[in-house]
Amino acid sequence: LYNTIPRCVMDGGTGRSSALVFSGVDDEEFRLLKNDDTNPERRFVRNMSNNSICADTPEDYAKIAKILPPLIKEAGEPGVFNRFLARCGMSRHADPRLKRVRGTNACSEVLLEGWEFCNLASAILQRCMNPDGTIDYNKLRNACMLAAFYTAIVACNPLNEARAEAVRAENLRVAVSLDASFVGYETLSNQEFGTLLKSCKELIITYVDAYTMAIAGKKSVTHTCFKPGGKIPPLADSLSSINGPICSQYVELRRII
């Protein structure tokens, strides 16, 4: 299944897909799936997914922090998904809907419930530059507005799967990512770059909430994320990404808009 999906997805002329698989803290077999000495027969299939261990309590995280470093040094994985912090949110007034988070998309940018689709658009900072190498703030603003508008429409569209539709209608989950944000770090001072990120976040939240309220009468559970890197597609300033859940696993399908 996972080998077939990339043939159906095009990103800048290249087939692309990714999958993220989770396990609990005490699953020793899972930890060693990408170890060549333990599982040599998996050498040619181990890159079909990214593997991460879920930490549901501070104690889980403390345990993982002691176990994983030598495994990561050897095979680069498994990673860690701190589900405890994901459910707490970033403020004292975190949306209570976050308590239902079970997983993420394949890059772990967007928190997801079971059977929830990830709806992500990326504004590419490096595509919002003036000829002299400075940031074109009007173009960046327009990119954020367009990404917010596009994802809000997608979030409010009904789905053809009852379980996914129930979660979509409750959350209207939207994610707008500012990709290639390393450009701002290299171009601006730390204070200027911090101000830029805060301004983009506030802009995206304002427009996403305005659009989803106008369309569906409800605010989105999530809004933004930022990436230090980011692939730059040759044909567009933003990407759309829709993740379809298959049981407890999530498959990312990314395409150009």
Region locations from a protein language model:
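Short, well-ordered loop/turn elements at secondary-structure boundaries
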Residues: T4, T14-R16, S49, A62-L68, ...
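Alpha/propeptide regions of enzymes that mature by internal proteolysis
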Residues: L1-C8, D56-L71, P78, M145, ...
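Secondary-structure capping and boundary motifs in well-ordered enzyme cores
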Residues: E109-F117, A143, A166-S177, L196-Y207, ...
